[in-house]
Amino acid sequence: LDRARKWERRSLNFKQEVDDMKAVLYCRVNGPQTSFALDAIKGQQLYLMDYAKKNNIEIAGIYLDVGYHGRTMDRPGLQSVIQTLKEGNADVILVANYNRLYRGRFPQELQELPVVSLKEQNRKRERGGKEHDI
């Protein structure tokens, strides 16, 4: 069972779905580059890194966007995340919360990518940007 098909199996629980996968970690804050914003993004990063370590998830990259609104795709970190997955260098995007990746309806380009939110661990977004229980 390859990793892409493993992702599609709904009978697996969250731990089984992400265990032994390669993930890109993505963090975002939309405020200006202040000490508060930098602390917030550092908190997201540490939260994701700690989770990955505890669950044997290999980190393929960590991408950050500071000062970018969540309703735009024009973010350098986000574009790097998409490129990393398209090149096959990671299996999943790991975020602290779905709204760190995008606010509102997921654009088509994001709808095609596997995303796991730690805050919503029992849910995942699939094609079409719809969430469902796993």
Where are these predicted regions, by residue range?
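Short, structured surface patches at the beginning of a domain
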Residues: 1-134
